[in-house]
């Protein structure tokens, strides 16, 4: 049985699995593309939810499914959910007044994931003022940081 991984990038610029071949791209977005490919090669089922608009199209690229972040499913379960550069997908309803973002679309995803990870690429993390609270109270399981 292969594990399903959702990578959520709600603050990145538009991209899909072919963007690196067509134009320059930020390091965080490039990392999502490249890591997704590698995880797929290792046998994981990977879905990237990001801004698939303009020249970035939803579809399957190198075995990775790219879907528009606005189409977050309300009944699809992922074993691992990785949020790139923000805690927003993991903020429970009772804490959403602390952020300027409606995270209700992520409710099913966050409550059914076996492992919830924030992948920090930059010097900031959207929602960093509640990051510690979310980790201490079990809403986020792991933090990945780049040096």
Where are these regions (language model features)?
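N-terminal subdomain of nucleotide-sugar transferases
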Residues: 1-51
């Amino acid at each position: 049985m292969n594990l399903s991984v959702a990578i959520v990038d709600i603050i990145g610029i538009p991209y899909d699995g072919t963007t690196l071949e067509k134009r320059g791209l930020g390091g965080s977005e490039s990392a999502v593309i490249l890591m997704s490919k590698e995880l797929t090669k290792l046998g994981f089922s990977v879905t990237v939810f990001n801004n698939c608009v303009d020249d970035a199209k939803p579809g399957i690229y190198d075995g990775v499914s790219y879907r528009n972040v606005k189409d977050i499913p309300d009944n699809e379960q992922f074993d691992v959910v990785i949020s790139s550069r923000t805690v927003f997908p993991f903020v429970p309803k009772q804490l959403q007044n602390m952020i300027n973002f409606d995270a209700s679309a992520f409710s099913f995803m966050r409550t059914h994931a076996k492992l919830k990870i924030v992948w920090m690429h930059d010097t900031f993390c959207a929602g960093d003022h509640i990051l510690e609270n979310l980790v201490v109270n079990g809403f986020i399981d792991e933090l990945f940081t780049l040096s």
